[in-house]
């Protein structure tokens, strides 16, 4: 049995499959009954976030008159008919307790603080969006959008697309599913298609589309479009459909009531990645949004565009994201139980969005949209998705879960389909030919498959089931085989008194670096101590290491590891080394947020027991990344070689190096102590620490030089374009030019000559601008006593308090009499006493954000003045740390939840 390295107990138990999700900013959400519990995997027993599922009032969709009799002693406003038309399940479901059914994290950058949004679908069919309480100082997450309410308003404004004639308002007879679809039963029942294809959303057929020669031409489907409404005042397109002018108090048939309720009853949610499109020649017209898919009981999937904020902040804000309904796809004839998104295309010019949907009728379909259609869809509200292929036809066994990944290793799409019978299928689709073939179908479990998760670019697959088994599979070419989950765990710190009496496993999720696995399990309460454990431990989240898994790679281990050590075999060391290097290589992608928590935690665990293995992995990564080849030389000889290459490597590599230096190789030192050593003297008797301190110092100086150069270049370009081009408020404008110039003067002997030249040009330009704001801000004031502050360091400052003039003494006493101030790590200006951006790795504060160009630089620019003006166009500047590259956040008290990228 695999050994967990940490765990987190839950006070409530999950009830549905796919109960756990891992966000791209390193937070874990668990749908546990009437609560959604958010956990920081770096502090599993620490503070948590909560979402309490509220009771939902039924929507006013109509009244049903009894077809045979009128019940006496009931008010005239009540019409009942529970035994006809399928109304009995609709009535019974309102008596159930609130419960979270499905959840999905958005991509990073959707929250106002550049974090992730969480979409939650309840058992009552309601979908809402939540943001973290970054400025509210509470544990409860903040609801920002009620998507179900928006859907109700849109549909009710059109009378649900039904004809006004009473003779045509009735629908066909229907079968239904058992409403209580909890994991304890999970039975599949037949159900006919709901009459949702006549919504007043224009219907269109895409059966033989010329742009997709390989799509399934036999399976017809309906894509429902949103109509464009005109405002009476200015005639422009309105972003929202008109609201209903009346409540639905008319009498309707039971069949119509069930049909309307099925349209509004959501079952599953899925976020796409954050998409970026330029709608014009200027970056000011950049479109940034994510697609939110919501599956319903009617078999339809509604596609919503949720636009990202134009700017990010950490102050309190009541602004909600702009959300628009773009299309409703009649995807299946029964409940849409699960969905998954993917992106096909190596670059933005050939981007294709892929949506896979699974239904309780056993069918699975693949939908696709081109980039041009997505951009057009934003403007004219037309659906851009067409049916690419029906992978699985109607089947009596329902689809319980999906996992979909587009593998760059195989240049193919890998689709895993979990079913209620305990089996799962793996399908492969070639991107070039769009040929879809089934690789395997296996009876992996005895009960319903409750979770599937791909790892290592589609080479490994995890499956879990209600039978409490978790299995690991390796995909090699067109075959899949099961491999055992390694029992050896580096740095095992799991508590021994944690019970192992689990009943079922209800979800599996992978960390951003793929090195850790999270499992959510329900306890068998009857086997727990009724006095203590049974009261507070209904379920648990287990964490397993995934680094020792075979990933299909055939790399040989380094010669240094020649025998088993500390219970690890030579092959396990080889797998760890391969997976470490794979994860580090993946983070070179600028579109992937720099979240290194799992890698840092694993390296620290190995460092305690086998530090030479960590040094071996880092030596190989540093030599390959910085020198271009594997240099099998000692670390003390390698460091001088790579430090000379800093100006020729991308900024992302420098950020990864800084994080590893601080959190792994200098982990014995506190962050404040590391910062002090970077500015002052070091101990000569700590050779290894001095080696990494020197490497960290030179890497951070390289990043600061790039920032200073970009700041000077942006200012000069903006000054030269005045009078010829209208000034744009969207361009990034540098701050603290006076402080940046002083830093260049202090470090004139080590900075590149190009920076000295630019600094002199900026100084001359500021002198010519008599009304320049930068010139007036050359002398800074203390925000507490208004005393002058001189520039002596880029990290901190001391004001010249009037008290210190009365007493000329040592520097220490002088500093005691003055205020110690922090400087912004970007502008080097004195930070005001207001909420600031905070880095969890280097503990620096940031007032002004660095330009996005800095994080994408492939090397130090040879000619900063030749950079195009578009390099400084503001496309929602991302709050990333200048030195670490991780997401900045507002500093929270220790008793409140916050994400830990490292």
Language-model features, listed with the residues they occupy:
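Canonical WD40 repeat/beta-propeller blade segments in eukaryotic WD-repeat proteins
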Residues: 11-20, 96-110, 152-168, 172, ...
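Long intrinsically disordered, low-complexity regions that are acidic and Ser/Thr-rich
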Residues: 160-240, 299, 362
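Short C-terminal beta-strands that terminate individual repeats in beta-propeller domains
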Residues: 8-11, 50-51, 92-94, 257-260, ...
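C-terminal scaffolding/assembly regions of large eukaryotic complex subunits
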Residues: 2-13, 19-20, 26-27, 524-902
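Structural hallmark of WD40 beta-propellers
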Residues: 25-29, 111-119, 278-282, 286-293, ...
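Beta-propeller domains
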Residues: 2, 26-93, 130-155, 216-250, ...
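Conserved strand-to-loop turn within each blade of WD40 beta-propeller repeats
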Residues: 32, 121-124, 295-298, 358-361, ...
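WD40-repeat beta-propellers
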Residues: 36-41, 103, 127-132, 269, ...
């Amino acid at each position: 049995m695999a050994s967990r390295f940490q765990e987190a107990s839950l006070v409530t138990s999950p009830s549905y499959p796919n109960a756990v999700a891992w966000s791209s900013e390193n937070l874990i959400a668990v749908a546990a009954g009437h609560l959604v519990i958010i956990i920081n995997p770096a502090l599993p027993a620490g503070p948590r976030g909560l979402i309490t599922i509220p009771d939902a009032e039924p929507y006013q969709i109509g009244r049903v008159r009894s077809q045979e009799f009128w019940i006496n002693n009931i008010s005239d406003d009540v019409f009942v008919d529970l035994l006809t038309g399928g109304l009995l399940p609709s009535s019974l479901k309102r008596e159930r307790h609130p419960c979270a059914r499905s959840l999905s994290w958005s991509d990073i950058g959707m929250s106002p603080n550049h974090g992730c949004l969480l979409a939650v679908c309840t058992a009552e069919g309601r979908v809402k969006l939540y943001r973290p309480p970054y400025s509210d100082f509470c544990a409860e997450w903040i609801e920002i959008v009620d998507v179900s309410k928006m859907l109700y308003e849109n549909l009710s404004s059109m009378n649900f697309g039904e004809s006004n004639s009473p003779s045509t308002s009735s629908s066909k007879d229907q079968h239904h599913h058992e409403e209580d679809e909890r994991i304890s039963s999970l039975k599949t029942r037949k159900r006919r298609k709901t009459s949702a294809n006549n919504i007043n959303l224009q219907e269109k057929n895409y059966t033989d589309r010329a742009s997709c020669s390989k799509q399934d031409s036999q399976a017809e489907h309906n894509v429902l479009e949103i109509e464009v409404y005109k405002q009476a005042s200015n005639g422009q397109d309105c972003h929202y459909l008109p609201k209903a002018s009346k409540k639905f108090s008319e009498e309707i048939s039971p069949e119509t009531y069930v049909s309307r309720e099925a349209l509004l009853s959501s079952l599953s949610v899925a976020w796409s990645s954050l998409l970026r499109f330029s709608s014009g020649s200027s970056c000011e017209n950049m479109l940034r949004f994510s697609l939110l898919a919501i599956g319903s009981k009617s078999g339809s999937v509604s596609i919503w565009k949720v636009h990202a904020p134009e700017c990010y902040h950490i102050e309190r804000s009541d602004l909600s994201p702009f959300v628009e309904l773009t299309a409703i796809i009649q995807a299946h004839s029964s409940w849409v139980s699960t969905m998954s998104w993917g992106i096909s295309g190596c670059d933005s010019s050939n981007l294709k969005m892929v949506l896979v949907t699974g239904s309780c009728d056993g069918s699975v379909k693949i939908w696709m949209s081109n980039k041009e259609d997505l951009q057009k869809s934003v403007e004219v509200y037309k659906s851009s998705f067409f049916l690419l292929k029906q992978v699985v036809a109607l089947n009596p066994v329902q689809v319980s879960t999906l996992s979909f990944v587009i593998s760059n290793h195989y240049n193919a799409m890998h689709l895993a389909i979990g079913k209620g019978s305990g089996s799962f299928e793996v399908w492969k689709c070639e991107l070039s030919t769009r040929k879809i073939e089934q690789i395997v179908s296996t009876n992996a479990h005895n009960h319903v498959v409750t979770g599937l998760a791909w790892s290592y670019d589609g080479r490994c697959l995890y499956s879990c089931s209600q039978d409490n088994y978790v299995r690991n599979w390796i995909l090699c070419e067109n075959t899949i085989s099961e491999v055992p989950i390694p029992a050896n765990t580096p740095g095992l710190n799991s508590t021994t008194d944690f019970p192992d009496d689990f009943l079922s496993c209800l979800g599996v999720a992978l960390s951003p670096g793929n090195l850790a696995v999270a499992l959510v399990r329900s306890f068998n309460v009857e086997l727990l101590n009724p006095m203590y454990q049974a009261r507070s431990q209904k379920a648990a989240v287990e964490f397993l290491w995934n680094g020792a898994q075979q990933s299909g790679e055939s790399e040989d281990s380094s010669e240094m590891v020649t025998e088993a050590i500390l219970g690890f075999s030579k092959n396990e060391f080889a797998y760890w080394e391969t997976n470490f290097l794979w994860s580090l290589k993946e983070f070179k992608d600028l579109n992937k947020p720099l979240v290194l928590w799992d890698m840092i935690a694993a390296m620290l665990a190995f460092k305690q027991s086998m530090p030479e293995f960590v040094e071996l992995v880092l030596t190989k990564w540093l030599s390959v990344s910085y020198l271009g080849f594997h240099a099998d030389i000692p670390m003390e000889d390698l460091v001088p070689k790579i430090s000379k290459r800093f100006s020729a490597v991308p900024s992302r590599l420098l950020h990864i190096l800084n994080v590893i230096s601080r959190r792994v190789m200098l982990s014995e030192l506190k962050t404040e102590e590391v910062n002090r050593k970077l500015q002052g003297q070091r101990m000569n008797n700590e050779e290894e620490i001095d080696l990494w301190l020197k490497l960290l110092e030179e890497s951070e100086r390289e990043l600061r030089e790039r920032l200073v150069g970009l700041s000077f270049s942006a200012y000069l370009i903006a000054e030269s374009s005045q009078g010829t081009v209208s000034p744009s408020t969207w361009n990034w404008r540098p701050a603290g030019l006076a402080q940046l110039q002083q830093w260049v003067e202090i470090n004139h002997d080590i900075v590149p000559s190009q920076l000295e030249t630019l600094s002199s040009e900026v100084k001359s330009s500021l002198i010519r601008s008599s009304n320049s704001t930068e010139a007036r801000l050359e002398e800074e004031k203390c925000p507490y006593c208004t005393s002058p502050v001189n520039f002596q360091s880029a990290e901190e400052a001391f004001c010249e308090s009037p008290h210190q003039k009365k007493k000329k003494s040592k520097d220490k006493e002088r500093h005691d009499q003055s205020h110690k101030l922090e400087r912004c790590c970007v502008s080097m200006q004195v930070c005001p006493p207001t909420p600031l951006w905070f880095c969890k790795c280097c503990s620096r504060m940031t007032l002004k954000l660095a330009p996005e160009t800095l994080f994408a630089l492939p090397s130090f620019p040879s000619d900063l003045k030749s950079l195009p003006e578009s390099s400084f166009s503001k496309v929602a500047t991302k709050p990333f740390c200048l030195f670490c590259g991780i997401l900045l956040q507002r500093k929270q008290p220790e008793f409140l939840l916050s994400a830990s990228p490292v």
